[in-house]
Amino acid sequence: MNQNHRALWSCAMAAALLLTACGKTNAGSGSSGSMSGSSGTSSAQTQTAAWKTGLGVVTEATDQDRAGKIELAAAAVLLDGEGKLESVLLDELEVSVSADSTGHVTLPTDWRTKRQKGDDYPLAEVSSLKKGWAEQADAFANYLIGMTPEQVSMLKVDKDGKPTDADLLSGCTIAVDRYRDAVTRACANARALGAAKGDRAALGIEAVNGTSDITATDDKDVNAQVDVSIVALTTDADRRVTSAIADMAEPALTVVSDGGVTAPDLVKTKLELGEDYGMRGASALGKEWYEHSEGFCDALKGKTRTEIAGLSGGDADLKALCTIDITDLQKAALDALS
């Protein structure tokens, strides 16, 4: 996604958030008019008090000659009863793929995210702040606390996607436009799922190689794919899960027999695909993927990390809610709680 496309998406999301906010205000006024005054006030207070959990994923794929890159940014957010950011956690996965003139594909050997790599992602060495990726990403996340989704969506960056605000630059000099967009998307997706005041947002990612072949031929291209499982959680003071959202993305670069690499224009997650994912007809439960995901998330609520580690896809109660393979989603949830 180039800078122009990203800017257009940010403007569209800001407009959508503003329209959503206006729509909610008007809907509340209409409801009050059709009820007694005390009943309408009580309903409005209940809606306002709901704390919301959100997950946003922004995936960009680029190509150049015989090389390509997939960059996936994810944000877990917790919105307070006034709709302002209370807790934010960010992470990013970067996957580089190359090919030679015979169509042979070279894939990464390390599928960890930037946060998971820690000191193995050597940003601090070249940073003017001498800070690593996690420190700078957390500084950006902390800067957003107390903002509304609209304020986040309108955060200004320079032509390289880097912050322009002096206060933010004192703790973060990396490009943040993709993280801003992920947070904005997470806010737009946020729902009341059980989180409450005092909870904290958590985020976990499990990425695995989804590529079956490594050499393209005249008859068959290679889809250099990474399968990414993402789980956003909120936890209480006892580190028990109070809400959860689980999603997956399968971005892929196409490699042809002469080594040329082509990136997709758009990558949607399974939650974003919704009914278009097309799983319902093949599901023993008659459920679409997002409904299986909701069943898995329901099974996480109230549990600690140790209890989640003991979950089994073969458990009868879980199978009644979810029959998809939970292996990588479970690992992502455990990563969020580590």
Regions found by a protein language model. Name each.
Residues 47-338:
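Active-site- and interface-proximal helix/loop "cap" or "latch" segments in soluble metabolic
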Residues 6, 27, 275-278:
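Intrinsically disordered, low-complexity segments enriched in glycine/proline and serine/threonine
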Residues 23-25:
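Bacterial signal peptide processing site
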Residues 1-11:
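Bacterial N-terminal signal peptides that target proteins for export
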Residues 27-28, 204:
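Composition-driven recognition of long, C-terminal low-complexity regions enriched in serine/threonine
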Residues 18-21:
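C-terminal motif of bacterial Sec signal peptides marking the signal peptidase cleavage site
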Residues 29-47:
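Low-complexity, Pro/Thr/Ser/Glu-rich flexible segments characteristic
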